[in-house]
């Protein structure tokens, strides 16, 4: 039996979703981490980049723990994100600008 998996990170407007698939495309586990919405102007929405980053790490950790697998068993990673989104990270500190 092949014990390798595909990890998908879906970074949406309201939450970070992480889904683990087996090689047959079946969902093994899923995790959802909601993040706070900020509305500085009508029709605008902003997010805390640090919160998103932490949500991604926590969701991945939870998926690996719940599925009882290691990162070594992840054979592929897919990432989807919000359209029309920009985020800048400081090269020296690794922190969001």
Language-model segments: which ranges?
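N-terminal glycine/serine-rich phosphate-binding loop of ATP-dependent small-molecule kinases
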Residues: 1-97
């Amino acid at each position: 039996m092949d014990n390798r998996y595909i990890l998908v990170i879906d970074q949406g407007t309201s939450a970070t979703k992480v889904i683990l698939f087996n090689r047959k495309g079946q969902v093994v586990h899923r995790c959802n981490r909601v993040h706070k919405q900020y509305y500085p102007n009508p029709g605008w929405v902003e997010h805390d980049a640090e919160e998103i980053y932490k949500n991604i790490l926590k969701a991945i950790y939870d998926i690996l723990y719940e599925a009882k697998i290691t990162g070594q068993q992840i054979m592929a990673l897919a990432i989807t994100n919000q359209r029309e989104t920009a985020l800048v990270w400081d090269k020296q500190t690794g922190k969001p600008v």
